[in-house]
Amino acid sequence: MKRLVFILLLSLTGFAVHAQSTFTVGDGSFLLDGKPFAIRAAEVHYPRIPQPYWEQRIRMCKALGMNALCIYIFWNVHEQREGEFDFTGGNDIRAFVRLAQKHGLYVIVRPGPYVCAEWEMGGLPWWLLKKRDIRLREQDSYFMERLERFERKVGEQLADLTIDKGGPIIMVQVENEYGSYGEDKAYVAAVRDVIRRSDFDRVQLFQCDWSSNFTKNGLDDLLWTMNFGTGANIDDEFRRLGELRPHSPKMCSEFWSGWFDEWGRPHETRDSHLMVDGLREMMDKGISFSLYMTHGGTNWSHWAGANTPG
């Protein structure tokens, strides 16, 4: 752990969030106010942290040397009953993002609709299944109408906190690892358009996936980022991206620091040295990353989700 803190602190620079800054994609790098910027993000999930501990966890992420937080927005947390939205208390995503800004951290928002995250139904509300013929994560009219209604509510909470408006939000994700599920580019494009109509039309949009999946669902007008874990050959992971987009910034949007436990199986562990070595290599090469997870938190109530049907 001391090794990890030391390495991350080496990259620590002043990251106060300034009013009306710019965050753009340059030739091979991200640009913050026109200058090269490497993202060092901590993935944390606000529903897995009691609200009284939010600020303390955020401060711990910054103490690691992180300059950003990466957060999913969980649809089924905020709309547990159809048409009834809750962004209060432990669901107050605006307050969470404001706390990040208070401590000089940027924010990457990932509003789904599907988030995976080993969460109940991947973040999709249970009540969608009351319509027996619904097609989830497709251009099903019922699904898309309710998806847009939710994303507009997210926009009401967060759209005025993007970096061009003086807030800390630098990027917003479209869908989540969709190439592992389907190949419907038209659906991904429809979700992108919903995000833009939710007032995220001036912030950088991106999609994440495994390196083998972008030819299935990658959109030309979105930034592409990779997901992989400790022990991966980092050059190999980015090789295909380099072939498809040689001038794109490199970012591992989920650098898996560990793995989830499954019921009845031994506790999963990973070699911390491999994680540290991977982080060091990415920092040495100017590759941006989000450490997934930096703080795992706790699955309260019934929110833990299954990854397999068995």
Label the model's feature ranges:
Residues 54-120, 192-203:
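Aromatic-lined substrate-binding rim segments of carbohydrate-active enzymes
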Residues 142-221:
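Active-site neighborhood of glycoside hydrolase catalytic domains
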Residues 83-91, 101-102, 113-138, 152, ...:
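Aromatic- and acidic-residue-enriched segments that line the glycan-binding/catalytic groove
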Residues 34, 61, 69, 100, ...:
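Conserved, mostly hydrophobic/aromatic
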Residues 4, 17-68, 98, 102-104:
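N-terminal carbohydrate-binding accessory modules
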Residues 39-50, 74-92, 129-149, 173-184, ...:
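The substrate-binding groove and active-site-proximal loops of carbohydrate-active enzymes
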Residues 5-14:
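Bacterial N-terminal signal peptides
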Residues 101, 105, 197-198, 202, ...:
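Catalytic-core region of carbohydrate-active enzymes that cleave or remodel glycosidic bonds
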